[in-house]
Amino acid sequence: MTPHSARPWPYPRWVAHRGAGTLAPENTLAAFRKGAEHGYRMFECDAKLSADDVVFLMHDATLHRTTNGHGIGGDLNWQHLSQLDAGSWHSRNFSGEPLPTLANVAQFCIRNRYFLNIEIKPTPGIEYKTGEVVAREAAHIWQHEAVPPLLTSFQVESLKGAFKTAPHLPRGLLLNSLSEGWLDTAKALECCAVVCLYALWTPETVKAVHDAGMKCLSYTVNDEWAAEHLLQLGTDGIITDRVDVFSPAA
């Protein structure tokens, strides 16, 4: 099996954060459609498990910020979660927008030949299991597709679960700081990318990642000066909320 770091990089440079940043309710199909309207072909989303192991999209552990529900999303069965309103918090135009499953989003992406970055966002306490289940489902859904989704996580245990379950799927280590051993961790997980808070990239860190055969991605880049700096550094991917500002053709 060819190591991921040695394979060609198939993904676009520009990635729409949570579908379309703040232009639509995050992590919904409405957001993906909005991002696509602005020309984006790759999307980032957050995936976690319901109590009955359905993979669905949501960033927070709790429901109250982005739905009309309450409590911890991972404590509820999908039948309950599927009835929630995930759009009204954003604006009246999106009232009634449901939480999507990973399968819903995958269907949209595959049908339109879009690319997906799935951030594994586990409910605390089930990091490894979430990585396993997300990877297993992604491997099944994309088994006949030329380009699989990129699986990323801040949680090393989630990436370990994904690695064990579907080692052929590409992985990226998410970082909000460069603690000791960060690059060795990415290597041990056989990652193809390191996804950093954009301010962490320097000529030295970019070179270290590239020399290790991995790509450098950045989150969440919403200012033009930051995007220009990252392009000058030679980074490989930019995750942004501002799909209305940055042209994905740039």
Annotate each predicted stretch with a short phrase.
Residues 1-250:
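Phosphate-group recognition and catalysis centered on beta-loop-alpha active-site segments
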